[in-house]
Amino acid sequence: PRGPLRPLCRPINATLAAZBZACPVCITFTTSICAGYCPSMVRVLPAALPPVPZPVCTYRZLRFASIRLPGCPPGVBPMVSFPVALSCHCGPCRLSSSBCGPGRAZPLACBRSPRPGL
């Protein structure tokens, strides 16, 4: 049997960016995020029932890690926390921990020139 054309929901490594308006440097770092295909059902006939939310690839288990932005002035917290995916599943989107919009062709990027971090 043929598998799906797109990889199923799983943790993958991704390079993200962290910056703060008050700090002069943007850092790029690598973490694991949830990404991939989630099977969904589409109603063939219009129904009187409300639409069923489509499942998204989201965190099942995660931990948080932190990095320090260099060069922040006194009084500005230089620490930035980010999620690290330990496992993923297809489920409802939780806006508290996930970006539920359409996938991006480009990763999140810095507004200023990035400096490699972790």
UniProtKB/Swiss-Prot annotation:
Q: Which GO BP terms sit in this record?
A: G protein-coupled receptor signaling pathway
Q: Which residues are glycosylated?
A: N13
- Where is it localised? Secreted
Asked if the keyword Electron transport belongs to this entry, the reply reads no
Q: Which cysteines form disulfides?
A: C9-C57, C23-C72, C26-C110, C34-C88, C38-C90, C93-C100
CDD domains from the entry? GHB_like (cd00069)
Subunit structure comment from the entry: Heterodimer of a common alpha chain and a unique beta chain which confers biological specificity to thyrotropin, lutropin, follitropin and gonadotropin.
Similarity comment: family membership: Belongs to the glycoprotein hormones subunit beta family.
Record protein name field: Lutropin subunit beta
